[in-house]
Amino acid sequence: MSTGHVSTIDTPISPFTAIVAMDGAVLASGWTASADDLLPQVSPSLRPTTLAHRRDLGEVTRAVRAYHAGDLDAIADVRVRQRGGEFMGRAWDALRTVPAGKPISYADYALLAGRPTAVRAAASACARNAATLFVPCHRVIRTGGATGNFRWGADVKRWLLAHEA
């Protein structure tokens, strides 16, 4: 039996909720007011069996507030924990190296993740990313410059990209 902590923070976009492990690592996050939207995204082997609601998640809450207030690097050192195959892990790690204000294409993302021909797998890594914001999948766009898909909606992705520009 494991317990995760959850908190919702008001942001200029919409409420932002994060689920963190007992050690403070982010398991899932996104622009929603409901932990129920996030829990299914957590790998079953990491998924908490109970959630304890908190007003403040310490480092995570500070980073979310600072990021939305303009400190775009505030999210860089927040610990995350996700499970996926070897490529997924490399791809999520690679995403954390993409600087704010410098979006990349899915093809460039596949190259950065070490598999230049695996564009679909790179897109899948974005889609399966549970730790949105901290693993900034919003920084991956289509080759022609279109924003592409985003779990939390095109308006949220456009806001994030404009905020980081």
Language model features with spans:
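Basic nucleic-acid-binding alpha-helical/helix-turn surface characteristic of O6-alkylguanine DNA
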Residues: 1-116, 165
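Active-site and channel-lining beta-strand-loop segments
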Residues: 18, 140-142
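Short Lys/Arg-enriched helix C-cap and helix-to-coil transition segments
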Residues: 133-140
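…primarily DNA-binding HTH/wHTH and HhH modules…
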Residues: 143-165
